[in-house]
Amino acid sequence: MVCFAFIGFTANAQDATLDGYSAQSCPAQFHSLPLYPEAKLCQLFDDALPASLTYHATTDQQSTRDFYTSELGEADSIQELKGRIVLEYENANKIIVISKDGAGTQVDVLVKST
């Protein structure tokens, strides 16, 4: 069974802090997993494995899912849990959680091992 926590946040253009954390510039990739183009409000929670990063994409959930399918191929497992799309790759060692967030999506990238 896979357990993970969802970190919610809200922000606007004037306020780039997330519950006491400052948002970081978004990389193009995180542990070889791509981020949606023009990702915003990246928050790195841990870069050492197991690692996690959260960001905001200005697109809907389905477009974000289509991006990951195009970039990584069909996921080993696709689940919809409480309005979130959960994509698992490489025997659940790489997990992408796509949640509705205002006019866009929040994307949680979780990497257990590479």
Regions found by a protein language model. Give the residues of each.
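An acidic-aromatic pocket/loop used at catalytic or ligand-binding sites
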Residues: 9-114
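Bacterial N-terminal signal peptides
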Residues: 1-8
